[in-house]
From Swiss-Prot:
The gene is Nkx3-1. Residues 24-34 have a biased composition (Polar residues). Residues 1-96, 108-130 are annotated as: Disordered. Ubiquitinated by TOPORS; monoubiquitinated at several residues and also polyubiquitinated on single residues. Belongs to the NK-3 homeobox family. This is Homeobox protein Nkx-3.1. It comes from Mus musculus (Mouse). Residues 1-14, 38-47, 57-71 have a biased composition (Basic and acidic residues). Disulfide bonds: none annotated.
Length: 237
C-alpha cells in the first residue's frame, strides 16, 4: 500500500524567519548628480561633524604614528601639509643679485678702495712725422718750384722715384703751399706798411694797431663817407 508523503511545513526559526526565505535585499541609495542634491549632501555632512565635536577624531592623532613599544622610541610627527614647502615655491635669489649686493656692501665699507685704485689714463697717440732725406727735399722743392699742384699720375710717378708714398708727397705739397701763402701775405703787409702815407711817428701808438690802419687805408678810396660820420677818427686828427 502506497503512502503518500505528507508535505512538510516549513520550519520557522526563532524570530519568525524561514531558512528557505530569500535574504532581504539591501536598498542601495542612488547617487544624484544634481547641484541641489550635491549641496544638500555636503551641508548634511558638515552639520553632522559640527553637531558632535566631542566625537570628531583628531586629525593630528590619526596622522601621528604610534610610538614603537619594543624600543620605547617614538617617531616625530611630520609637519602638516600647510607648512611644507615645495621646491618650486621656495624663493631662490638669483646669483647675479647676490654678487651685486656683495659688491655694494664692499663699496660702502671700503670707500677708499675705489679712490686708491690706479686709474689707467689712455694717452693720445702722437702722429708720426715722416722724415725726408736731403735728396728727397731737394727733388720736392725743385718740382714745387715748377708746379704747385700735381695730378694723381704725376704724384704717383714722383713718389715712386723718391721711394715715398703718395700720401707723403701729397701732404708735403699741401704744407709747402700753406707756407708759401703765409710768407707771401706777410711780405705784402710789410710792403704796404712801408709805402703807406699814414706811417708817421704819431701813428706808433699802442691804442691804434697798425693792422687797423692798413685796413682803413685800403678801404678809404671805396668808403670815404665813413670818416664823415664821426664814428671813428685817428688820434692825431
Amino acid at each position: 500500500m502506497l503512502r503518500v508523503a505528507e508535505p512538510r511545513e516549513p520550519r520557522v526559526e526563532a524570530g519568525g524567519r524561514s531558512p528557505w526565505a530569500a535574504p532581504p535585499t539591501q536598498s542601495k541609495r542612488l547617487t544624484s548628480f544634481l547641484i541641489q542634491d550635491i549641496l544638500r549632501d555636503r551641508a548634511e555632512r558638515h552639520g553632522g561633524h559640527s553637531g558632535n565635536p566631542q566625537h570628531s577624531p583628531d586629525p593630528r592623532r590619526d596622522s601621528a604614528p604610534e610610538p614603537d613599544k619594543a624600543g620605547g622610541r617614538g617617531v616625530a610627527p611630520e609637519d602638516p601639509p600647510s607648512i611644507r614647502h615645495s621646491p618650486a615655491e621656495t624663493p631662490t635669489e638669483p646669483e647675479s643679485d647676490a654678487h651685486f649686493e656683495t659688491y655694494l656692501l664692499d663699496c660702502e665699507h671700503n670707500p677708499g678702495d675705489l679712490a686708491s685704485a690706479p686709474q689707467v689714463t689712455k694717452q693720445p697717440q702722437k702722429r708720426s712725422r715722416a722724415a725726408f732725406s736731403h735728396t728727397q727735399v731737394i727733388e720736392l722743392e725743385r718740382k714745387f718750384s715748377h708746379q704747385k699742384y700735381l695730378s694723381a699720375p704725376e704724384r704717383a710717378h714722383l713718389a715712386k722715384n723718391l721711394k715715398l708714398t703718395e700720401t707723403q708727397v701729397k701732404i708735403w705739397f699741401q704744407n709747402r703751399r700753406y707756407k708759401t701763402k703765409r710768407k707771401q701775405l706777410s711780405e705784402d703787409l710789410g710792403v704796404l706798411e712801408k709805402n703807406s702815407p699814414l706811417s708817421l711817428p704819431a701813428l706808433k701808438d699802442d691804442s691804434l694797431p697798425s693792422t687797423s690802419l692798413v685796413s682803413v687805408y685800403t678801404s678809404y678810396p671805396y668808403y670815404p663817407y665813413l670818416y664823415c660820420l664821426g664814428s671813428w677818427h685817428p688820434s692825431f686828427w
